[in-house]
């Protein structure tokens, strides 16, 4: 039992000591402003540019509809093995949900690029 406790203690302490040594030895002693800033081919860095929320919303909507289209693709393969009535109803329900979501986004103005 004592051997087990010793090996567990060593297995926890040894990596902690190694990580502590690596952290302290790898620190830079001099913080240079030019070396800390991003390199942008001689141009002034544009880190504080405002990001368009409208562009972000369009990207998220595209991502959502892209995933939904990827979910539609296997429906054609399922058609051969399932009941045609169940397949038709489930496909129509899925497409109606897509269209309702598109209408909602359109109605809320999320698809308008400019005011």
Swiss-Prot record:
It is a multi-pass membrane protein. The keyword Disulfide bond does not apply. InterPro entries: NADH_UbQ/plastoQ_OxRdtase_su3, NDAH_ubi_oxred_su3_sf. One of its GO terms (molecular function) is NADH dehydrogenase (ubiquinone) activity. Keywords: Electron transport, Membrane, Mitochondrion, NAD, Respiratory chain, Translocase, Transmembrane, Transmembrane helix, Transport, Ubiquinone. GO terms for cellular component: mitochondrial membrane; NADH dehydrogenase complex. The chain crosses the membrane at residues 1-21, 58-78, 84-104. It comes from the Eukaryota. Its main location: mitochondrion. It catalyses: a ubiquinone + NADH + 5 H(+)(in) = a ubiquinol + NAD(+) + 4 H(+)(out). It is found in: Mitochondrion membrane. Its EC number is 7.1.1.2. It is an enzyme of class 7 (translocase). Core subunit of the mitochondrial membrane respiratory chain NADH dehydrogenase (Complex I) that is believed to belong to the minimal assembly required for catalysis. Complex I functions in the transfer of electrons from NADH to the respiratory chain. The immediate electron acceptor for the enzyme is believed to be ubiquinone. Belongs to the complex I subunit 3 family. This is NADH-ubiquinone oxidoreductase chain 3. It comes from Locusta migratoria.
């Amino acid at each position: 039992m004592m051997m087990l406790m010793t090996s567990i203690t060593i297995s926890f302490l040894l990596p902690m000591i190694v990580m502590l040594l690596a952290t302290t030895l790898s620190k830079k002693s001099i913080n240079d402003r030019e070396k800390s800033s991003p390199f942008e081919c001689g141009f002034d860095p544009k880190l504080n540019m405002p990001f368009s929320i409208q562009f972000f919303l369009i990207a998220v909507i595209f991502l959502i509809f892209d995933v939904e289209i990827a979910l539609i693709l296997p429906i054609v393969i399922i058609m051969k093995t399932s009941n045609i009535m169940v397949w038709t109803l489930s496909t129509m329900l899925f497409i109606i949900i897509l269209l309702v979501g598109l209408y909602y986004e359109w109605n809320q103005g999320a698809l308008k690029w400019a005011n």
